[in-house]
């Protein structure tokens, strides 16, 4: 998948809008490490798996090429599609030559060749026709009476997505262990938390980290809500991927708790937002997307567009999610009754159409967080990254006390030469922890279903999922999905 399947980068007023519009190229500037201005010749080998996707390939290549610390490194592009891979390779080589950049680059359809000597591996794959399979994940369970809001990462749709994509990712990781066992593997593919949890259970020696940029909503929204620059705030968020909330927020100047102000002021902000359709209308009329306050003054607004579950979390749980309903609502049994279904469908149709028309290009600017993390490792910087996906018990201590050690959580982490070290968040508020705990058995059974190629365990993963409120028809639904997606799910016995 052209990654960023992790969702869609958040920006301007609507997280989903910014990710699609900017092709997931919005930089998340949180506690960003300094960019070194003197050349440090690292000569690292950085492998991009899934690089035939122009969105992922061009964006990540640009991220690497803008980094002074990594000058002298060799970039290896790998994809199973030789035609798209060749286009990305030729474009990248021409860009490097045009700008006289101190990097080398090659491409290969042979994964083992690509991984030979790798220091860092960045994975962003999808299998089959992304949108055709996604629509099956979403719509077929609905035909059997399952009420799911999106079908990408949670609920039955998230299960089938996971059952398809995890086996090839395990194959990639097995090759990493055999060929370049010391390499760091960074994953952008979804369903993030199920992928990462399964990899760490099946191949615990792999240095596997999941990255998602939904955290990028906070620098976009909180300054507008609180009236202060994001740099004036000390914010930490955590939970599971696409299922995280702001846990603490303080003003740096005096240490005051900013959450009371968030709870007071956020409803007026999110209750008067432009929908994606209205922003797209503005784009068609003006030729540009609204970004500044004066732009949004000309865009019609509505109440909580694609943020009705978000609204319940803020008003009833006192917590602000870092993403919108199409992600957060996938994991909650009551979300279907609350969510803005039209907003979700509008986003999906826009996103699908936009990706078919967008023409990505290489730019020398930072768009994602993987390169700062790599830079933090190679320079032993010790900076804090705002959101990574790592095992809850990594480094011998729990990040979130009221979740099990083995599940992969999303949390801040410090980055140094030894790797990524999760920042302890303690006990999460019990209400939010209860929602997260509902996913524990789902993730465990998903991992075991893949590892043991077990249809019975896949069925159990459905039966313990809070999105599933019925037994009747469930086995027929599972068998229907296996039949429709037999090239990818036929291994389930």
Please report, for each region that a protein language model flagged, where it lies by residue.
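Short, positively charged and aromatic/hydrophobic N-terminal segments
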Residues: 13, 25, 29-34, 38
